[in-house]
């Protein structure tokens, strides 16, 4: 948001504190709040994420991911909408989260000016609770898996989104990752490996050829992040502050 506000007028609607306007709380959400303003561009990153959590709350994931997105598409049919999809959408039958992302992509196809950004496994210095890497850093992880994941740092992800903003002719869906999957077990070889983890993809790897053609080049690696070679000195690209 800070990078966008340097040259644009930005309106944010979010559950988090910090917005100057259109902050919403737990008593209202994007299904009920007023959508009166018009925009040149909408970046829709809202929704519920998390594969395992979705198994316990499929209705909540459908409501927050599918119904909210459909409302935005219908309300702004002529506005360019970049929305957060997921690599999970490649196998929608595995879990409710993947299914919700796939259905959003299907709904978006009815509108000619939408782009689903298929984020792969995003990490940063301030992840949501329960994320694999945070548990690993906090020594709370009990086991690893045989999965391979394409980890992408939040700063690289933001660079990708900004590139897509500048390329309005790109529609449909597009992968945003590094193109280099990492074996989960290799990140913590001292921990036991669990083989059977239902509802999860065995392998994810972003095809970033389209993004590379637009000038996208990931800068960060998860291995260096975990060894603190970069983690302690990552500079906030938005305002020059260490985060």
Q: Could you describe each region identified by the protein language model?
A:
Residues 1, 142-243:
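C-terminal substrate-binding subdomain of Rossmann-fold SDR/epimerase-dehydratase oxidoreductases
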Residues 96-98, 102, 106-158, 162:
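NAD(P)-dependent short-chain dehydrogenase/reductase
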């Amino acid at each position: 948001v800070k990078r966008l506000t340097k040259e644009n007028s930005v309106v944010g609607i979010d559950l988090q504190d910090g917005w100057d306007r259109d902050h919403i709380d737990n008593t209202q959400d994007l299904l009920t709040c007023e959508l009166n303003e018009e925009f040149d561009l909408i970046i829709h990153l809202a929704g519920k994420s998390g594969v395992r959590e979705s198994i316990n709350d499929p209705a909540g994931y459908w409501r927050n991911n599918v119904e909210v997105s459909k409302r935005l598409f219908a309300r702004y049919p002529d506005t360019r909408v970049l929305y957060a999809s997921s690599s999970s959408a490649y196998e929608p039958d595995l879990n409710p989260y993947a299914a919700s992302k796939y259905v959003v992509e299907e709904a978006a196809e009815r509108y000619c000016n939408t782009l689903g950004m298929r984020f792969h496994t995003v990490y940063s210095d301030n992840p949501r609770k329960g994320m694999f890497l945070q548990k690993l850093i906090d020594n709370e992880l009990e086991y690893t898996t045989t999965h391979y994941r394409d980890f992408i740092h939040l700063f690289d992800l933001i660079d990708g989104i900004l590139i897509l903003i500048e390329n309005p002719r790109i529609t449909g869906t597009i992968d945003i990752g590094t193109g280099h999957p990492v074996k989960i077990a290799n990140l913590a070889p001292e921990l036991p490996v669990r083989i059977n983890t239902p509802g999860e993809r065995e392998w994810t790897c972003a095809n970033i050829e389209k993004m590379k053609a637009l000038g996208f080049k990931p800068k960060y690696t998860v291995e260096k992040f975990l060894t603190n070679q970069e983690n302690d000195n990552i500079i906030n690209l938005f305002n020059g502050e260490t985060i």
